[in-house]
From Swiss-Prot:
One of its GO terms (biological process) is snoRNA guided rRNA pseudouridine synthesis. Non-catalytic component of the H/ACA small nucleolar ribonucleoprotein (H/ACA snoRNP), which catalyzes pseudouridylation of rRNA and is required for ribosome biogenesis. This involves the isomerization of uridine such that the ribose is subsequently attached to C5, instead of the normal N1. Pseudouridine ('psi') residues may serve to stabilize the conformation of rRNAs. The H/ACA snoRNP complex also mediates pseudouridylation of other types of RNAs. The H/ACA snoRNP complex mediates pseudouridylation at position 93 in U2 snRNA. One of its GO terms (cellular component) is box H/ACA snoRNP complex. Component of the small nucleolar ribonucleoprotein particles containing H/ACA-type snoRNAs (H/ACA snoRNPs). It comes from Cryptococcus neoformans var. neoformans serotype D (strain B-3501A). The keyword Ribonucleoprotein applies. The gene is GAR1. Residues 4-28 are annotated as: RGG-box 1. It is found in: Nucleus, Nucleolus. This is H/ACA ribonucleoprotein complex subunit GAR1.
Amino acid sequence: MSGRGFSRGGGGGFRGGARGGRGGGRGGFQQRDMGPPDTVLEIGSFQHDVESEMLCSLTAPTKIPYFNAPIYLQNKTQIGKVDEILGPINEVYFTVKMEQGMLASSFKKEDKVYISGEKLLPIERFLPKPKVAGGKERGAQGGRGAPRGRGGAGSRGGRGGFSSRGGPGGRGGARGGAGGRGGFSSRGGGAPRGRGGFRGRGQ
């Protein structure tokens, strides 16, 4: 998954997350060869299937999964990989692209899914950085500092959490809710597709 679709304000953190996710993907292939991790942690609960993928709500509010991180059942059977991360920062959702032979429609609402603890990032990575004390004073001295200060305002884009297909919705409104300011964005900000009223996966 590319980081190019991420909103500019949250760019630094999201690009870091994407790079980590790609690394996680490679790690996942190695891990699959070596078997599942020694322990798995609960990361989400299944809400409903969307386009043959699982839409899950995040149940670990201080952690965000890597993109492409393997997702397991409690018995460590791998069922898929994290495909997209969606929704506002205080109500995060993610989709799981299923492994061959696995059907998202076979799961029941609130079924738990699990992840290796090594495939999680602290949510602080995706929050705006606090302003440095005295930064305004230095910027107020004028000259080149002032434009930089204004440029820094771009970080407002990272205020919330994740946006794109939005958060949950009913089956008809699949992934169609949240979005807009302050959200995780994924797979580009393409024009809305007709199918659930959500943003597409890129142009």
